[in-house]
Amino acid sequence: MKNQNLSVRKLARCGMVAALYVVLCMALQPFSYGAVQVRVAEALCLLPVFGAEYIFGVVLGCFLANLLGSTIVDVIFGTLATLLACLVTYKLRNIRFKGLALAASLPPVVFNAVIIGIEIAVMFPDPTSSAPLWLACVTNGISVGIGELISCTVLGVLLVRIIEASPSVRKVFEA
């Protein structure tokens, strides 16, 4: 019975994380979508630092948010980028720099910069530009990467720090 209660608790936490991701994206919609974006909900990509079950919650939230506010291509590739980012974030969860989860914040930045940068360049080419596709991919990747740095390396690391600093809050997030 105790294992069943633990599973129900983990499932409930995943559902809450997914819902929070969607709510943050919808509430901050002008900032959450497009080539220039700071998707505040991406700070939640650092929650796998506290357990693998958060991978599912964040990925589900990303999938639903993209389903509600983006294209089918972004539903697929944006969700894939978030899945890969969360998996690697989980693997890097114990690497700390001066006590901060900085290493864990980098996978969302890198995966989203590369995957979404390419997606935007291919799906929304600038008809007024004669620049090669690779340059558009790099330019869009830098733009997305800067937004992800703000969301994950600033807000996400701060979120992890706040959770870890409070034993009662940390207990809620850990298995």
Question: What is each residue range found by the language model?
Answer:
Residues 30-35, 43, 63-81, 88-175:
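Membrane-embedded alpha-helical hairpins and interfacial helices in multi-pass inner-membrane proteins
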Residues 2-56:
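Hydrophobic transmembrane alpha-helices
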Residues 48-58, 93-102:
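Membrane-helix interface "capping/anchor" motifs
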Residues 21, 58-66:
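Small-polar-interrupted transmembrane alpha-helices in polytopic inner-membrane proteins
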